[in-house]
Amino acid sequence: MLSYLIFALAVSPILGKIEIVFPQHTTGDWKRVPHEYNYCPTSADKNSHGTQTGIPVELTMPKGLTTHQVEGFMCHSALWMTTCDFRWYGPKYITHSIHNEEPTDYQCLEAIKSYKDGVSFNPGFPPQSCGYGTVTDAEAHIVTVTPHSVKVDEYTGEWIDPHFIGGRCKGQICETVHNSTKWFTSSDGESVCSQLFTLVGGIFFSDSEEITSMGLPETGIRSNYFPYISTEGICKMPFCRKQGYKLKNDLWFQIMDPDLDKTVRDLPHIKDCDLSSSIITPGEHATDISLISDVERILDYALCQNTWSKIESGEPITPVDLSYLGPKNPGVGPVFTIINGSLHYFTSKYLRVELESPVIPRMEGKVAGTRIVRQLWDQWFPFGEVEIGPNGVLKTKQGYKFPLHIIGTGEVDSDIKMERVVKHWEHPHIEAAQTFLKKDDTGEVLYYGDTGVSKNPVELVEGWFSGWRSSLMGVLAVIIGFVILMFLIKLIGVLSSLFRPKRRPIYKSDVEMAHFR
Protein backbone atom coordinates (compact mmCIF):
# COMPACT_ATOMS: atom_id res chain seq x y z
CA MET A 1 0.00 0.00 0.00
CA LEU A 2 2.91 2.35 0.66
CA SER A 3 4.03 2.10 -2.97
CA TYR A 4 0.53 3.09 -4.13
CA LEU A 5 0.56 6.16 -1.87
CA ILE A 6 4.05 7.25 -2.90
CA PHE A 7 3.25 6.97 -6.59
CA ALA A 8 -0.10 8.73 -6.22
CA LEU A 9 1.60 11.67 -4.52
CA ALA A 10 4.41 11.78 -7.07
CA VAL A 11 2.29 12.13 -10.19
CA SER A 12 -0.57 14.35 -11.17
CA PRO A 13 -3.95 12.68 -11.73
CA ILE A 14 -4.26 11.52 -15.32
CA LEU A 15 -7.63 12.29 -16.85
CA GLY A 16 -8.73 11.40 -20.37
CA LYS A 17 -6.11 10.56 -22.99
CA ILE A 18 -2.70 9.30 -21.92
CA GLU A 19 0.56 8.64 -23.75
CA ILE A 20 2.48 5.48 -22.87
CA VAL A 21 5.18 3.29 -24.35
CA PHE A 22 4.04 -0.20 -25.36
CA PRO A 23 5.65 -3.25 -27.02
CA GLN A 24 5.51 -3.36 -30.82
CA HIS A 25 4.74 -7.10 -30.75
CA THR A 26 1.20 -8.36 -30.07
CA THR A 27 2.39 -11.71 -28.68
CA GLY A 28 5.61 -12.80 -27.01
CA ASP A 29 8.19 -15.55 -27.28
CA TRP A 30 8.25 -15.93 -23.50
CA LYS A 31 11.19 -17.25 -21.49
CA ARG A 32 11.68 -17.56 -17.73
CA VAL A 33 13.48 -14.68 -16.04
CA PRO A 34 16.92 -15.82 -14.78
CA HIS A 35 17.55 -15.61 -11.05
CA GLU A 36 20.40 -13.08 -11.28
CA TYR A 37 18.49 -10.75 -13.65
CA ASN A 38 17.52 -7.43 -12.06
CA TYR A 39 16.42 -4.88 -14.68
CA CYS A 40 15.09 -1.45 -13.74
CA PRO A 41 14.15 1.07 -16.47
CA THR A 42 15.20 4.69 -16.67
CA SER A 43 12.56 7.27 -15.85
CA ALA A 44 10.19 8.54 -18.52
CA ASP A 45 11.48 11.36 -20.73
CA LYS A 46 8.08 13.05 -20.95
CA ASN A 47 9.26 16.38 -19.53
CA SER A 48 12.98 16.13 -20.27
CA HIS A 49 12.77 18.95 -22.82
CA GLY A 50 11.34 21.38 -20.25
CA THR A 51 10.08 24.57 -21.90
CA GLN A 52 11.88 24.00 -25.22
CA THR A 53 9.80 24.30 -28.40
CA GLY A 54 9.36 21.25 -30.60
CA ILE A 55 9.97 21.24 -34.38
CA PRO A 56 8.65 18.19 -36.33
CA VAL A 57 11.42 16.38 -38.25
CA GLU A 58 10.95 13.26 -40.39
CA LEU A 59 13.75 10.76 -39.76
CA THR A 60 14.72 7.32 -41.03
CA MET A 61 16.45 4.52 -39.11
CA PRO A 62 17.17 0.83 -39.69
CA LYS A 63 14.01 -1.21 -39.17
CA GLY A 64 13.27 -2.25 -35.58
CA LEU A 65 13.78 -5.57 -33.87
CA THR A 66 10.55 -7.10 -35.15
CA THR A 67 11.83 -10.01 -37.23
CA HIS A 68 15.59 -10.13 -36.73
CA GLN A 69 16.58 -12.94 -34.43
CA VAL A 70 19.03 -15.82 -34.45
CA GLU A 71 18.46 -19.40 -33.36
CA GLY A 72 20.70 -21.09 -30.82
CA PHE A 73 20.84 -23.38 -27.80
CA MET A 74 21.17 -22.84 -24.08
CA CYS A 75 23.55 -25.46 -22.69
CA HIS A 76 22.90 -26.28 -19.03
CA SER A 77 25.18 -28.31 -16.79
CA ALA A 78 24.60 -29.55 -13.27
CA LEU A 79 25.96 -32.06 -10.79
CA TRP A 80 23.16 -34.45 -9.81
CA MET A 81 23.89 -35.98 -6.42
CA THR A 82 22.39 -38.78 -4.34
CA THR A 83 23.53 -38.56 -0.71
CA CYS A 84 23.33 -41.49 1.71
CA ASP A 85 23.46 -40.53 5.38
CA PHE A 86 24.02 -43.79 7.32
CA ARG A 87 25.42 -42.62 10.65
CA TRP A 88 25.96 -45.09 13.50
CA TYR A 89 23.33 -43.48 15.70
CA GLY A 90 20.48 -43.26 13.18
CA PRO A 91 18.68 -44.91 10.30
CA LYS A 92 19.73 -44.68 6.66
CA TYR A 93 18.61 -41.36 5.12
CA ILE A 94 18.68 -40.63 1.35
CA THR A 95 18.55 -37.12 -0.19
CA HIS A 96 18.70 -35.85 -3.78
CA SER A 97 20.17 -32.52 -4.87
CA ILE A 98 21.51 -30.66 -7.90
CA HIS A 99 24.44 -28.22 -7.94
CA ASN A 100 25.68 -25.61 -10.42
CA GLU A 101 28.54 -26.73 -12.64
CA GLU A 102 30.09 -24.86 -15.56
CA PRO A 103 29.90 -26.91 -18.78
CA THR A 104 32.84 -27.23 -21.15
CA ASP A 105 32.47 -26.27 -24.80
CA TYR A 106 33.04 -29.89 -25.82
CA GLN A 107 30.28 -31.14 -23.51
CA CYS A 108 27.85 -28.60 -24.93
CA LEU A 109 28.67 -29.32 -28.57
CA GLU A 110 28.20 -33.06 -27.95
CA ALA A 111 24.89 -32.40 -26.16
CA ILE A 112 23.68 -30.19 -29.06
CA LYS A 113 24.64 -32.91 -31.56
CA SER A 114 22.72 -35.51 -29.54
CA TYR A 115 19.70 -33.20 -29.35
CA LYS A 116 19.67 -32.64 -33.11
CA ASP A 117 20.08 -36.40 -33.71
CA GLY A 118 17.18 -37.13 -31.37
CA VAL A 119 19.25 -39.31 -29.04
CA SER A 120 19.63 -37.01 -26.03
CA PHE A 121 18.99 -38.82 -22.75
CA ASN A 122 18.88 -37.79 -19.11
CA PRO A 123 19.74 -40.77 -16.85
CA GLY A 124 18.55 -38.99 -13.71
CA PHE A 125 20.02 -39.35 -10.23
CA PRO A 126 22.78 -41.94 -9.70
CA PRO A 127 22.00 -44.98 -7.50
CA GLN A 128 22.75 -44.60 -3.82
CA SER A 129 26.06 -45.78 -2.40
CA CYS A 130 25.84 -46.41 1.34
CA GLY A 131 28.46 -47.36 3.90
CA TYR A 132 27.71 -47.88 7.58
CA GLY A 133 28.74 -44.95 9.77
CA THR A 134 29.41 -42.62 6.81
CA VAL A 135 27.81 -39.93 4.65
CA THR A 136 28.43 -40.89 1.01
CA ASP A 137 27.74 -38.92 -2.19
CA ALA A 138 27.09 -40.53 -5.57
CA GLU A 139 27.53 -38.02 -8.42
CA ALA A 140 26.43 -37.73 -12.05
CA HIS A 141 27.50 -34.91 -14.40
CA ILE A 142 24.51 -34.10 -16.62
CA VAL A 143 24.48 -31.66 -19.55
CA THR A 144 21.25 -30.74 -21.36
CA VAL A 145 20.36 -28.23 -24.08
CA THR A 146 17.22 -26.26 -24.89
CA PRO A 147 16.49 -24.19 -28.03
CA HIS A 148 16.78 -20.46 -27.28
CA SER A 149 16.51 -17.69 -29.88
CA VAL A 150 17.87 -14.18 -29.24
CA LYS A 151 17.40 -10.78 -30.87
CA VAL A 152 19.95 -9.09 -33.13
CA ASP A 153 21.20 -5.51 -32.92
CA GLU A 154 20.75 -4.23 -36.50
CA TYR A 155 23.66 -1.82 -36.14
CA THR A 156 26.41 -3.96 -34.64
CA GLY A 157 25.22 -7.51 -35.33
CA GLU A 158 25.46 -8.29 -31.60
CA TRP A 159 23.12 -10.77 -29.95
CA ILE A 160 20.71 -9.21 -27.40
CA ASP A 161 19.24 -11.17 -24.49
CA PRO A 162 18.93 -10.58 -20.72
CA HIS A 163 20.68 -13.91 -20.07
CA PHE A 164 23.92 -12.51 -21.52
CA ILE A 165 26.34 -10.72 -19.22
CA GLY A 166 25.65 -7.04 -19.88
CA GLY A 167 22.68 -7.98 -22.07
CA ARG A 168 24.82 -8.33 -25.22
CA CYS A 169 27.25 -10.77 -26.79
CA LYS A 170 29.19 -11.21 -30.02
CA GLY A 171 30.34 -14.64 -31.13
CA GLN A 172 29.11 -18.20 -31.48
CA ILE A 173 29.60 -19.02 -27.78
CA CYS A 174 28.32 -16.63 -25.11
CA GLU A 175 28.63 -16.64 -21.34
CA THR A 176 25.42 -16.01 -19.38
CA VAL A 177 24.53 -14.70 -15.95
CA HIS A 178 24.20 -18.35 -14.89
CA ASN A 179 27.61 -19.91 -14.23
CA SER A 180 26.09 -23.26 -15.20
CA THR A 181 24.74 -22.13 -18.59
CA LYS A 182 26.26 -21.10 -21.93
CA TRP A 183 24.61 -20.08 -25.21
CA PHE A 184 25.69 -21.58 -28.54
CA THR A 185 24.80 -20.68 -32.13
CA SER A 186 26.06 -21.64 -35.57
CA SER A 187 25.08 -18.26 -37.04
CA ASP A 188 27.62 -15.65 -38.07
CA GLY A 189 25.02 -12.86 -38.06
CA GLU A 190 23.68 -10.87 -40.97
CA SER A 191 24.99 -7.93 -42.91
CA VAL A 192 23.83 -4.80 -41.09
CA CYS A 193 23.10 -3.10 -44.42
CA SER A 194 20.63 -5.83 -45.41
CA GLN A 195 18.09 -4.25 -43.06
CA LEU A 196 15.17 -2.21 -44.33
CA PHE A 197 15.08 1.42 -43.23
CA THR A 198 11.88 2.82 -41.76
CA LEU A 199 10.46 6.31 -41.40
CA VAL A 200 9.98 7.59 -37.86
CA GLY A 201 8.32 10.74 -36.64
CA GLY A 202 10.80 12.92 -34.76
CA ILE A 203 10.68 16.19 -32.84
CA PHE A 204 13.66 18.50 -32.45
CA PHE A 205 13.58 20.67 -29.31
CA SER A 206 15.26 24.05 -29.01
CA ASP A 207 14.78 27.37 -27.22
CA SER A 208 15.48 29.28 -30.44
CA GLU A 209 12.85 27.35 -32.45
CA GLU A 210 15.41 27.04 -35.28
CA ILE A 211 16.80 23.84 -36.79
CA THR A 212 20.15 25.64 -37.09
CA SER A 213 20.62 25.25 -33.33
CA MET A 214 20.96 21.48 -33.66
CA GLY A 215 24.21 20.32 -32.07
CA LEU A 216 24.34 23.20 -29.59
CA PRO A 217 23.78 22.95 -25.81
CA GLU A 218 20.19 22.93 -24.53
CA THR A 219 18.83 21.14 -27.60
CA GLY A 220 17.48 17.63 -28.00
CA ILE A 221 15.57 15.22 -30.21
CA ARG A 222 13.07 12.41 -29.63
CA SER A 223 10.86 10.10 -31.69
CA ASN A 224 8.40 7.25 -31.37
CA TYR A 225 11.39 4.88 -31.41
CA PHE A 226 13.81 6.51 -28.97
CA PRO A 227 13.58 8.84 -25.95
CA TYR A 228 14.66 12.46 -25.62
CA ILE A 229 18.41 12.75 -26.23
CA SER A 230 20.59 15.85 -26.28
CA THR A 231 21.95 16.78 -29.72
CA GLU A 232 25.02 18.46 -28.23
CA GLY A 233 28.10 16.79 -29.69
CA ILE A 234 26.27 15.38 -32.73
CA CYS A 235 28.48 14.48 -35.71
CA LYS A 236 28.02 13.56 -39.40
CA MET A 237 28.44 9.90 -40.30
CA PRO A 238 27.52 7.87 -43.41
CA PHE A 239 25.91 4.47 -42.81
CA CYS A 240 25.07 1.89 -45.49
CA ARG A 241 25.59 4.49 -48.24
CA LYS A 242 23.22 6.92 -46.50
CA GLN A 243 24.25 10.29 -45.10
CA GLY A 244 23.17 10.69 -41.50
CA TYR A 245 24.07 11.83 -38.00
CA LYS A 246 25.31 10.14 -34.85
CA LEU A 247 24.25 11.35 -31.42
CA LYS A 248 26.59 11.22 -28.44
CA ASN A 249 24.88 8.02 -27.24
CA ASP A 250 25.87 6.40 -30.60
CA LEU A 251 22.32 6.43 -32.03
CA TRP A 252 22.21 7.01 -35.82
CA PHE A 253 19.46 8.63 -37.91
CA GLN A 254 18.95 10.33 -41.28
CA ILE A 255 16.95 13.53 -41.91
CA MET A 256 14.59 12.86 -44.83
CA ASP A 257 13.82 16.44 -45.87
CA PRO A 258 16.66 17.36 -48.29
CA ASP A 259 16.50 21.07 -47.46
CA LEU A 260 16.59 20.51 -43.70
CA ASP A 261 19.34 17.94 -44.13
CA LYS A 262 21.48 20.36 -46.17
CA THR A 263 20.91 23.11 -43.60
CA VAL A 264 22.07 20.88 -40.75
CA ARG A 265 24.93 19.37 -42.74
CA ASP A 266 26.35 22.81 -43.54
CA LEU A 267 26.38 23.96 -39.90
CA PRO A 268 30.02 24.72 -38.96
CA HIS A 269 29.75 23.31 -35.45
CA ILE A 270 28.68 19.83 -36.67
CA LYS A 271 31.86 17.95 -37.61
CA ASP A 272 32.49 14.58 -39.23
CA CYS A 273 32.59 11.60 -36.88
CA ASP A 274 35.86 9.79 -36.22
CA LEU A 275 36.60 6.99 -38.69
CA SER A 276 36.57 4.46 -35.85
CA SER A 277 33.08 5.48 -34.68
CA SER A 278 30.48 2.79 -34.04
CA ILE A 279 26.71 3.07 -33.72
CA ILE A 280 24.10 1.17 -31.75
CA THR A 281 20.34 0.67 -31.65
CA PRO A 282 18.24 2.40 -28.95
CA GLY A 283 18.80 0.33 -25.84
CA GLU A 284 17.15 -0.29 -22.51
CA HIS A 285 18.91 2.68 -20.90
CA ALA A 286 18.96 5.20 -23.76
CA THR A 287 17.63 8.15 -21.75
CA ASP A 288 20.08 10.88 -20.76
CA ILE A 289 19.68 10.41 -17.02
CA SER A 290 21.34 13.75 -16.24
CA LEU A 291 18.25 15.49 -17.60
CA ILE A 292 15.80 13.63 -15.36
CA SER A 293 14.82 15.02 -11.99
CA ASP A 294 16.48 13.21 -9.11
CA VAL A 295 13.22 12.73 -7.24
CA GLU A 296 11.48 10.98 -10.13
CA ARG A 297 14.54 8.88 -10.90
CA ILE A 298 15.02 7.73 -7.29
CA LEU A 299 11.31 7.03 -6.87
CA ASP A 300 11.12 4.93 -10.05
CA TYR A 301 14.22 3.00 -9.03
CA ALA A 302 12.96 2.40 -5.48
CA LEU A 303 9.60 1.10 -6.69
CA CYS A 304 11.29 -1.18 -9.22
CA GLN A 305 13.78 -2.57 -6.71
CA ASN A 306 10.98 -3.09 -4.22
CA THR A 307 9.28 -5.37 -6.76
CA TRP A 308 12.47 -7.39 -7.29
CA SER A 309 12.92 -7.65 -3.51
CA LYS A 310 9.40 -9.04 -3.16
CA ILE A 311 10.07 -11.63 -5.85
CA GLU A 312 13.41 -12.58 -4.27
CA SER A 313 11.89 -13.05 -0.80
CA GLY A 314 8.84 -14.94 -2.05
CA GLU A 315 6.35 -12.19 -1.18
CA PRO A 316 3.24 -11.77 -3.38
CA ILE A 317 3.24 -8.99 -5.99
CA THR A 318 0.43 -7.08 -7.69
CA PRO A 319 -0.04 -5.97 -11.33
CA VAL A 320 1.02 -2.49 -10.19
CA ASP A 321 4.30 -3.93 -8.85
CA LEU A 322 4.87 -5.70 -12.17
CA SER A 323 4.24 -2.50 -14.14
CA TYR A 324 7.18 -0.82 -12.34
CA LEU A 325 9.55 -3.19 -14.18
CA GLY A 326 8.53 -2.20 -17.72
CA PRO A 327 10.51 0.38 -19.76
CA LYS A 328 9.27 3.98 -19.63
CA ASN A 329 10.83 5.13 -22.92
CA PRO A 330 10.79 4.00 -26.58
CA GLY A 331 13.49 1.62 -27.74
CA VAL A 332 14.49 -1.96 -27.11
CA GLY A 333 13.59 -3.42 -23.73
CA PRO A 334 12.18 -6.43 -21.88
CA VAL A 335 8.48 -7.21 -21.49
CA PHE A 336 7.38 -9.02 -18.31
CA THR A 337 4.38 -11.15 -17.36
CA ILE A 338 3.39 -13.96 -14.98
CA ILE A 339 2.79 -17.46 -16.39
CA ASN A 340 1.88 -20.32 -14.03
CA GLY A 341 3.38 -18.54 -11.04
CA SER A 342 6.74 -17.83 -12.75
CA LEU A 343 8.09 -14.51 -14.00
CA HIS A 344 8.62 -14.56 -17.79
CA TYR A 345 10.05 -12.05 -20.28
CA PHE A 346 10.77 -11.46 -23.93
CA THR A 347 12.54 -8.61 -25.74
CA SER A 348 10.63 -6.16 -27.93
CA LYS A 349 10.82 -2.62 -29.27
CA TYR A 350 8.67 -0.08 -27.43
CA LEU A 351 6.70 2.63 -29.27
CA ARG A 352 4.85 5.70 -28.05
CA VAL A 353 1.12 4.97 -28.04
CA GLU A 354 -1.88 7.15 -27.19
CA LEU A 355 -4.81 5.66 -25.22
CA GLU A 356 -8.25 7.15 -24.66
CA SER A 357 -7.99 6.40 -20.92
CA PRO A 358 -6.29 3.97 -18.47
CA VAL A 359 -9.27 1.59 -18.95
CA ILE A 360 -10.21 0.90 -22.58
CA PRO A 361 -12.97 -1.33 -24.04
CA ARG A 362 -10.76 -2.68 -26.86
CA MET A 363 -7.04 -3.39 -26.78
CA GLU A 364 -6.29 -0.72 -29.37
CA GLY A 365 -4.23 2.46 -29.37
CA LYS A 366 -2.96 5.14 -31.73
CA VAL A 367 0.73 5.44 -32.55
CA ALA A 368 1.71 8.82 -31.09
CA GLY A 369 1.90 11.62 -33.62
CA THR A 370 0.01 9.66 -36.31
CA ARG A 371 -3.54 8.61 -37.18
CA ILE A 372 -2.61 4.92 -37.18
CA VAL A 373 -4.76 2.85 -34.82
CA ARG A 374 -3.34 -0.60 -34.14
CA GLN A 375 -4.13 -3.72 -32.15
CA LEU A 376 -1.83 -3.53 -29.12
CA TRP A 377 -1.89 -7.02 -27.62
CA ASP A 378 -3.45 -10.45 -28.15
CA GLN A 379 -1.97 -12.90 -25.61
CA TRP A 380 -3.27 -13.32 -22.05
CA PHE A 381 -2.61 -15.63 -19.11
CA PRO A 382 -4.77 -16.57 -16.07
CA PHE A 383 -4.31 -14.31 -13.05
CA GLY A 384 -6.89 -14.99 -10.38
CA GLU A 385 -10.33 -14.08 -11.71
CA VAL A 386 -8.89 -11.99 -14.58
CA GLU A 387 -6.12 -12.37 -17.17
CA ILE A 388 -2.73 -10.66 -17.28
CA GLY A 389 -0.67 -9.46 -20.22
CA PRO A 390 2.51 -7.39 -20.65
CA ASN A 391 3.88 -5.43 -17.68
CA GLY A 392 0.81 -5.91 -15.50
CA VAL A 393 -1.89 -4.95 -18.04
CA LEU A 394 -5.15 -6.73 -17.13
CA LYS A 395 -8.00 -8.11 -19.22
CA THR A 396 -11.19 -7.85 -17.15
CA LYS A 397 -14.96 -7.82 -17.67
CA GLN A 398 -14.88 -4.02 -17.34
CA GLY A 399 -12.23 -3.65 -20.06
CA TYR A 400 -8.46 -3.58 -20.43
CA LYS A 401 -6.76 -1.92 -17.46
CA PHE A 402 -3.32 -0.28 -17.31
CA PRO A 403 -2.54 -0.39 -13.55
CA LEU A 404 0.37 2.05 -13.53
CA HIS A 405 -1.75 4.75 -15.18
CA ILE A 406 -4.88 4.06 -13.13
CA ILE A 407 -3.03 5.18 -10.00
CA GLY A 408 -4.03 8.74 -9.18
CA THR A 409 -7.25 8.73 -11.23
CA GLY A 410 -9.59 7.53 -8.48
CA GLU A 411 -10.30 4.31 -10.38
CA VAL A 412 -8.20 1.96 -8.24
CA ASP A 413 -10.09 -1.30 -7.69
CA SER A 414 -9.51 -4.83 -6.41
CA ASP A 415 -8.27 -6.11 -9.79
CA ILE A 416 -5.00 -4.17 -9.77
CA LYS A 417 -4.41 -5.00 -6.09
CA MET A 418 -4.64 -8.79 -6.51
CA GLU A 419 -1.49 -10.45 -5.20
CA ARG A 420 0.33 -13.54 -6.46
CA VAL A 421 3.68 -15.12 -5.54
CA VAL A 422 6.04 -15.44 -8.51
CA LYS A 423 9.38 -17.23 -8.86
CA HIS A 424 12.67 -16.66 -10.65
CA TRP A 425 14.23 -19.19 -12.99
CA GLU A 426 16.70 -20.95 -10.63
CA HIS A 427 18.17 -23.77 -12.74
CA PRO A 428 16.66 -25.54 -15.78
CA HIS A 429 17.46 -28.98 -14.33
CA ILE A 430 15.22 -28.45 -11.29
CA GLU A 431 12.00 -29.15 -13.18
CA ALA A 432 13.46 -32.28 -14.78
CA ALA A 433 14.92 -33.48 -11.48
CA GLN A 434 11.49 -33.32 -9.82
CA THR A 435 10.27 -36.07 -12.17
CA PHE A 436 12.90 -38.49 -10.83
CA LEU A 437 11.80 -38.16 -7.20
CA LYS A 438 9.47 -40.65 -5.56
CA LYS A 439 5.77 -39.97 -6.05
CA ASP A 440 4.69 -41.66 -2.80
CA ASP A 441 3.68 -39.98 0.47
CA THR A 442 7.22 -39.52 1.75
CA GLY A 443 7.25 -35.87 0.64
CA GLU A 444 10.84 -36.04 -0.60
CA VAL A 445 12.46 -32.62 -1.07
CA LEU A 446 14.82 -31.73 -3.92
CA TYR A 447 17.79 -29.73 -2.64
CA TYR A 448 19.48 -27.09 -4.82
CA GLY A 449 23.11 -26.18 -4.14
CA ASP A 450 23.07 -28.23 -0.94
CA THR A 451 22.72 -31.95 -0.26
CA GLY A 452 20.48 -31.41 2.76
CA VAL A 453 23.01 -33.35 4.85
CA SER A 454 25.83 -31.61 6.71
CA LYS A 455 29.26 -33.24 7.01
CA ASN A 456 30.44 -30.84 9.73
CA PRO A 457 31.17 -32.89 12.93
CA VAL A 458 29.47 -30.32 15.16
CA GLU A 459 26.44 -30.17 12.91
CA LEU A 460 26.34 -33.96 12.79
CA VAL A 461 25.69 -33.97 16.53
CA GLU A 462 23.15 -31.17 16.08
CA GLY A 463 21.50 -33.25 13.38
CA TRP A 464 21.27 -36.11 15.85
CA PHE A 465 19.17 -33.97 18.18
CA SER A 466 17.21 -32.19 15.42
CA GLY A 467 16.04 -35.59 14.15
CA TRP A 468 15.71 -37.01 17.67
CA ARG A 469 12.75 -39.24 16.91
CA SER A 470 14.43 -41.25 14.17
CA SER A 471 17.78 -41.12 15.98
CA LEU A 472 16.22 -42.31 19.27
CA MET A 473 14.53 -45.19 17.50
CA GLY A 474 17.84 -46.11 15.91
CA VAL A 475 19.70 -46.03 19.24
CA LEU A 476 16.96 -48.06 20.95
CA ALA A 477 17.11 -50.57 18.11
CA VAL A 478 20.87 -50.93 18.63
CA ILE A 479 20.46 -51.36 22.42
CA ILE A 480 17.64 -53.85 22.06
CA GLY A 481 19.59 -55.74 19.43
CA PHE A 482 22.62 -55.86 21.73
CA VAL A 483 20.51 -57.13 24.65
CA ILE A 484 18.90 -59.79 22.47
CA LEU A 485 22.32 -60.85 21.21
CA MET A 486 23.68 -61.20 24.76
CA PHE A 487 20.56 -63.09 25.77
CA LEU A 488 20.97 -65.49 22.86
CA ILE A 489 24.63 -66.07 23.70
CA LYS A 490 23.71 -66.75 27.33
CA LEU A 491 20.86 -69.02 26.25
CA ILE A 492 23.10 -71.01 23.96
CA GLY A 493 25.58 -71.46 26.80
CA VAL A 494 22.87 -72.70 29.15
CA LEU A 495 21.40 -75.10 26.59
CA SER A 496 24.85 -76.39 25.75
CA SER A 497 25.55 -77.20 29.39
CA LEU A 498 22.21 -78.95 29.76
CA PHE A 499 22.63 -81.27 26.82
CA ARG A 500 26.34 -82.01 27.32
CA PRO A 501 26.94 -85.64 28.61
CA LYS A 502 27.94 -85.77 32.27
CA ARG A 503 31.46 -87.08 33.10
CA ARG A 504 31.40 -90.03 35.56
CA PRO A 505 33.91 -89.67 38.40
CA ILE A 506 36.73 -92.25 38.45
CA TYR A 507 37.71 -93.94 41.68
CA LYS A 508 41.02 -95.64 42.45
CA SER A 509 39.17 -98.81 43.20
CA ASP A 510 37.95 -98.94 39.65
CA VAL A 511 40.91 -100.80 38.20
CA GLU A 512 39.65 -100.83 34.66
CA MET A 513 39.13 -97.07 34.47
CA ALA A 514 42.22 -96.27 36.47
CA HIS A 515 44.24 -97.90 33.77
CA PHE A 516 43.41 -94.99 31.48
CA ARG A 517 44.37 -92.27 33.89
Swiss-Prot record:
Pfam families: Rhabdo_glycop_CD, Rhabdo_glycop_FD
UniProt region (Trimerization), positions on chain: 259-313, 387-409
Annotated region described as Fusion peptide, given as residue ranges: 53-172
Signal peptide (UniProt feature, chain positions): 1-16
Intravirion side: 496-517
GO term, biological process aspect, one: entry receptor-mediated virion attachment to host cell
Virion surface side, ranges: 17-474
Reported uses of this protein in biotechnology and industry: Used to pseudotype many virus-like particles like lentiviral vector, because of its broad spectrum of host cell tropism. Also used in viral vectors studies in cancer therapy.
Residue pairs linked by disulfide bridges in the UniProt entry: C40-C304, C75-C108, C84-C130, C169-C174, C193-C240, C235-C273
Function: Attaches the virus to host LDL receptors, inducing clathrin-dependent endocytosis of the virion. In the endosome, the acidic pH induces conformational changes in the glycoprotein trimer, which trigger fusion between virus and endosomal membrane.
Family to which this protein belongs: Belongs to the vesiculovirus glycoprotein family.
Subunit organization: Homotrimer. Interacts with host LDL at target cell surface.
Protein name per UniProt: Glycoprotein
Organism annotation: Vesicular stomatitis New Jersey virus (strain Ogden subtype Concan)
